[in-house]
Amino acid sequence: MTSTASAQQPVLRTKTPSYHAPPSTDPLSGATIHTLRCLDTPIHLGYHLIPHIAKTLLSTLPSSTYVLITDQNLEARCSVTTAFRREFEKAAVHLSSSHSWRLLTKVIPPGEASKSRDGKNAIEDWMFEHRVTRDAVVLAVGGGVIGDLVGFVAATFMRGLKFVQIPTTLLAMVDSAVGGKTAIDHPLGKNLIGSFHQPNYVFIDAAWLKTLPVREFSNGMAEVVKTAAIWDPIDFAKLESSAPAIRSAVLGPFAKDAPLDQGRTLETRTESQSLLLDVIRGSVGVKAHIVTIDEKETGLRNLVNFGHTIGHAIEAVLTPEMLHGECISIGMILEAEVARYMHGLSQVAIGRLTRCLKEYDLPVSLSDSRVTRLAKSLDVTVDRLLDIMKVDKKNSGTNKKIVLLSSIGDTVQNMASTVSDHIIRRVLSLAATVTPIHEQPNKPKVTLSTPGSKSISNRALVLAALATNTCRLRNMLHSDDTQVMMAGLHDLQAARFEFEDGGETIVVHGNAGALARPANDKQIYLQNAGTAARFMATVVSLVHNDGNQHPVVITGNKRMKERPIAALVDALRSNGTSIDYLEGHGCLPLAVKGTTHGFKGGKIQLSATISSQYVSSILLCAPYAAEQVVLELVGGQVISQLYIDMTIAMMATFGIKVERLLDPTTGRPSNTYRIPKGHYVSPDVYDIESDASSATYPLAIAAITGTECTVPNIGSASLQGDARFAKEVLEPMGCTVVQTATSTTVIGPKLGQLRQIGLVDMEPMTDAFLTASVLLAVAAHSPANGSTSNARPSTRITGIANQRVKECNRIRAMMDELAKFGVNTKEHDDGLEIFGIDYRQLHANVRVHCYDDHRVAMAFSVLASLAPGAILEEKRCVEKTWPNWWDDLERKLGIRVHGVDPECSPSLCISPSHFTKASAASTNGKPPTCLSQLTCGKALTPRKYSKHATIICIGMRASGKTFLGAIGAAALSRTFIDADVVFNEKLGAKDGLGDFVREHGWPAFRQKELEILQELIARHPSGALISLGGGVVETEACRQILAEYAQTKGPVIYIVRDTNAIVKFLATSDRPAYGEPVMDVYRRRNPWFSECSSAELVSYSEGESLAIQPCAMNVPDPSFTIQKKFGLETEVARFFKFVVGQDTNQIRDLVVDSRKGGRRTYFLSLTFPDVVPKLELIRSMESGSDALEFRADLLNPSGQPVTTPQIPPTEYVKNQLAALRHRTSLPIVFTVRTHSQGGMFPDGKQHEYFELISLALRHACEYIDLELGWDDDLLSAVVQAKGNSQIIASWHDWSGRLDWESESTAKIYEKACRFGDIAKIIGKATTMEDNYSLERFRAKVSATATKPLLAVNMGSVGQLSRIVNPVFTPITHEAMPFKAAPGQLSFRQVQTALSLIGQADARRFALFGSPIGHSLSPLLHNTGFAALGLPHQYELLESTEINDAVAAFVRSPDFGGASVTIPHKLNIIKLLDEVTDEAKTIGAVNTIIPIRDAQGVVTSLVGDNTDWIAIETLARRSLRTVHLADPNLTGLVIGAGGSARAALFALYRLGVKRILLFNRTLANAEKLAREVPPEWNVSVLTSLDEVAQLSADQSPSVVVSNIPAEGSTLDASSRGLIHLPTCMLRNPAGGVVIDMSYKPHYTSLLQLAQQVNTNHELAIGTNATKAPTRKLWAAVPGITILLEQGCHQFHRWTGREAPRAQIEAAAWDVYLQRC
């Protein structure tokens, strides 16, 4: 890169020479004009230029026709066409123009939609209609869309017309209007069709900017800041120092008596107008100069794309909600961070750029609330952005190029630089992983300067701001904390800030304590900056308030609103300052009103036991109090005295000497201070010491890795307590420490030789305890003096109690995160104890949750240098004190850092700790909307968690947490942990929890419960399912832990059970008594369970009864059925798999591009007011449906149809949903249809509507219908809270006025795609043309669609649209009480209609083989076709060989598929194009599937095998979840013939760990065992009696017989037959037996299963009059296997689930007759 740069020709970094020319007065118009040139194009800048434009064009570009094109918005606001026509007519008179001319005007629709081929054609057709000729001059009056579109029209119309740009937006003025680029959009991207066509003039009239919304002005300022950043440091300084004045030129306030054309001449132009025009002129000048040198963008011109590589990618995802300039603003910061990593761009430069962009209300991070509140923010992932960046005009092949800053006003190269993906990923990613380094032969020596001290920087800012003069602060920390402090002081008018030395020096012009309220009641937003918040609380009290003015509000982010400030508030209140808590007591936000004289002063008492910052806050402001302040510290030991001493020392430097009074009794210094009144006088220059807390991290790197590190500017003379860290912590741990007054050097011991130090008081250096903790974690050796209180080496850290109220509870954070690495800790009141381990025992691949705390992140990056695969989430939190820490860690300390995504969310807009985190640029500092805040009280909603995140179950005692949790754990193959069991094991409560409670009481129990919860979460972050005790939510600390876990780490599931059932169970329980009624306990806990959980699982009281397998009336036994299993266990497994995203039960092949065809999908709309009595009916109605629509708005507890709008009771909805869930396996579409949209839910009931939507989210519904009529913030909140649910964004128009091809419908579609995973638009047809219009709309949007579209017309005329709609067509059924919407059809009706209109061709199917005359296959498939209304036919094609008839059949155009049986299962392969891997493994094909293209033409024939699928499916359906999770699951296969290989394969795929194989001919079994893969783990038995030698629990749970029925017997004395001994079925957990023999259905094996079941029932005393709920052994006959494999064939051929009930009934009827 360096060589390339040096080889380039030097580029003069200036602007076009005309930029430097002074303005002139135009002789024609009298306006004051600045003139620039870009190539040959004059650019005129000024104010109120329409008269000037008219006179200039008539005099210099005479033409017969002037064509003015603008948009409807501008015309409506400014009457553009009228204004220009008037001035043209005036100009013609003024100029006495003799030539004939006309002015044609056209107003077009606004927005990007007009910038299309259709939009261009419309303009051109209009120009031809008006006989426009080649001498015409085209005027583009508008923003970028108008300029690009009209410019392209001018470029191509009659091969090119004269063209004038008159931009009216700031973005267009400084960007698109200059340079000659013109273009229109294509469905595949923006600006893909266009040309370079230089305008004849560009007229930049800044008066237009007053017509812009504030946001549009900011949007344009992004480009202004950008050009200054890459080219002109002087202009940049002007932009950052004069932002209020520049903004006021556009946003006001304006003088009431100002002339209407103010600014048109220099005499009337205000200072702010001149500043604005100056920065616009500067930006235009840069671009004009660059374009003049590089018109066609061969290199230099792409410098103006700074911020655009990443910014454009962000814009591609977030458009149109986020504007171009807003995305580029974020992109500039991210690209500057790339430059910092690659070329050392200073953090000062990034800080200046960040502050400057914020001054113009632009976002600077993806966590800005304007981004996070958008539904699309979930799609902003690293992979998505990198993929978009592949298509960028600056790229060279696959190499991505980014403009890299070297400093403010300069770039690394005079073109974009090549940047690798891993660097971009490193910058973009929210998390970081550190590559561990081990002992190196040549230990490196590193010298590393740390950033300026945060503590000193913040104090210096306050002191300098309150001073009477100017001070230059050097080495100040440029971070989030100091930025918000400067912003706050600026808003209070406390000081004016400037920058020198490239921003390294901050010049503070103090205002002598004369503060004022922020303009427009702006809140002072301090993020999570505790120091700034505490200092600012007293600073704002200096603002004088006569009692009539509003208070000043200081606020922060979520965590800042939890940090204590009560002691300081109490002290200020007692002194007369009025302070109100606006949210939680004792925390921000605060509304502060000073007195008439500001801060009163006098004697003040303050508790300083929590934070010394309270003391410093009052000390710093005390000189400006109305009375002399005497500050007395009360309440106990003062915390961090050294920081109080630091404040006093700094005050002395600024001219105020604080007197610490002596105790009259002892004569020793007391805790009382006298502060004289006065004004600070700043030193001319104040050098800020480097940060001692930050210095601990590089020094710790040296200590832990055995290397050497020197930190200059921190030594023994430091004011900071943390400077002691090296001598008092590292040296005793075995490091060599050399410390002078101004530097510290640490040399670490040999790797792994750190030692414990027993006891250390870190009260003087509390922030450094985190660094000490990670070092002590790998200190495996005892202290040098040999003293330790435990057998294991340990160190107890004391004096750090205040660390519990920092950015997080740091003591708990360190304990929890160290536990993940395998390090034990113990908490104490004033600190913690750490038990070290050998570094080689550290757990690998740990994900460290950083709690949005900079010190947690940096401390664990030290430990990660030895821990393989450690991932540090929220890496950006280091920006609080050391923004370039990750760069320095790699570039200076030599430890490689990579970017990774946090598991809790891949979105770059969502912090793992704060899903509602706001940035400093958010409006009034308010966080984005969250669903729970809006609609659901405090109930949480799901997230997309890691698939492996540990699940926690909570709920009332006896709700089923253990039972259901065990099922869930088995379904997910996870470890199940019962917290009650852990409690008993840890505390030896042999007689149960009741014993412990009786002995120690409930409070002691709750404390132990809290400790166990913390330990379980720390030790099992993934791969487990934990069931907690019912009372865990009684403790507030537990509730906070659970809520934080649910929001950031993993699912917390609330198990809900009917309270009456709970009471009944507890009546016989030995659990300790509550001491109060169970219902009272439930009422108290229920809200807590909701606010601590992210999902709810109903332990449905009827679930077990519903678990009985359904079957047709003529099926002899329920275990013979092919109908799908449902019930409690099935639903619990589905629920848990859905919550973690393992299997979301959603349709994966929804059609996106309707032009390409695809499988049509449908959902059945249920309209029952009570679904429970109709559950069996609903199952019979499911055939053909892909999902069920659950219409919550139509539910009614009375059981009567809903006739007027009403709100269904929430509990009723829950129970109805649970009942349906336990009776179907289909996905649920949860719908609440409002009355205006055609439903029965009252309009306007926002809270109740979203409460039901939240219910659906929490109950794991696969699809949720979300109406688009609600506010965007509400819709975004739902999308952010949807977890794994998919949103169907719906719009229903009942008026019949919806025009499918209108702009308004396009906007509805765009909005539906923005918020939904599926777009749903419903119109109403009155004519057939409405259906044709819909299909044209569908075809148009399909060209660029990324989301499936459900679009139909209601009404009988609209039925055609329902027939052809490919996605989730709502259908009804003849048995439904009424249709959910007019015109709904049944599935059969739709299929019949599709066939009639030629959209569903009739197909032919056949069975190949011999003999096949008695096969049930034709009956099976033809029954299915008829039941679903499909026009297909299945027949028999008998042959003993693969002949021409078979070949002709499979190659015929109407071939739909075929079944294959003996003798063709192998020979058929020669006719096939492909064979699946499964069929190859088994060595047989029994199914042929034709693959068709979008036109329906067969492109290939694929052979598959469904025999093994039938065996595996029926075995899995018959087994319990605990069977499938059994690590000793054993299977037995009898027979080694042709079907045995399919049976072995099926058991392997089932998850059987050991397969036993028996065959009467031993050699055949041994041969087969050798042929199959060794991972199948097949063992051959010489006799079935050998099973008796296995332990009972390792005996087979799955038995598959492949021998003829007549070949086996239960009689041990029979000769020549295989005897089936009872020992085969001795597993106490039972299982399933499958007999592949077709006849008879009641074989010896099935008889054996019946005998074992009978004996089992007798042994347990089953009441003969009561049907057992479940048999020990399920029995599956061969006929069931045949039907099951046939149903899988049916699905593969048709894409539809076979109607199993109808098929089963028909097949068994014929089968039993034949038997």
UniProtKB/Swiss-Prot annotation:
One of its GO terms (cellular component) is cytoplasm. Pathway: Metabolic intermediate biosynthesis; chorismate biosynthesis; chorismate from D-erythrose 4-phosphate and phosphoenolpyruvate: step 2/7; Metabolic intermediate biosynthesis; chorismate biosynthesis; chorismate from D-erythrose 4-phosphate and phosphoenolpyruvate: step 3/7; Metabolic intermediate biosynthesis; chorismate biosynthesis; chorismate from D-erythrose 4-phosphate and phosphoenolpyruvate: step 4/7; Metabolic intermediate biosynthesis; chorismate biosynthesis; chorismate from D-erythrose 4-phosphate and phosphoenolpyruvate: step 5/7. Residues 1-421 are annotated as: 3-dehydroquinate synthase. Residues 1-26 are annotated as: Disordered. Residues 434-895 are annotated as: EPSP synthase. The keyword Cytoplasm applies. PROSITE patterns: EPSP_SYNTHASE_1 (PS00104), EPSP_SYNTHASE_2 (PS00885), SHIKIMATE_KINASE (PS01128). The keyword Oxidoreductase applies. Residues 1-17 have a biased composition (Polar residues). The active site is at E297, H312, C877, H1292, K1320. Its EC number is 4.2.3.4, 2.5.1.19, 2.7.1.71, 4.2.1.10. It comes from the Eukaryota. Residues 948-1165 are annotated as: Shikimate kinase. Residues 1402-1715 are annotated as: Shikimate dehydrogenase. It catalyses: 7-phospho-2-dehydro-3-deoxy-D-arabino-heptonate = 3-dehydroquinate + phosphate; 3-dehydroquinate = 3-dehydroshikimate + H2O; shikimate + NADP(+) = 3-dehydroshikimate + NADPH + H(+); shikimate + ATP = 3-phosphoshikimate + ADP + H(+). It is found in: Cytoplasm. GO terms for biological process: amino acid biosynthetic process; aromatic amino acid family biosynthetic process; chorismate biosynthetic process. Residues 1166-1389 are annotated as: 3-dehydroquinase. It holds the Pfam family EPSP_synthase. Keywords: Amino-acid biosynthesis, Aromatic amino acid biosynthesis, ATP-binding, Cytoplasm, Kinase, Lyase, Metal-binding, Multifunctional enzyme, NADP, Nucleotide-binding, Oxidoreductase, Transferase, Zinc. Binds 2 Zn(2+) ions per subunit. NAD(+) binds at residues 71-73, 112-115, 143-145, 148, 168-169, 190, 208-211, 219. Homodimer. In the N-terminal section; belongs to the sugar phosphate cyclases superfamily. Dehydroquinate synthase family. The AROM polypeptide catalyzes 5 consecutive enzymatic reactions in prechorismate polyaromatic amino acid biosynthesis. This is Pentafunctional AROM polypeptide. It comes from Mycosarcoma maydis.
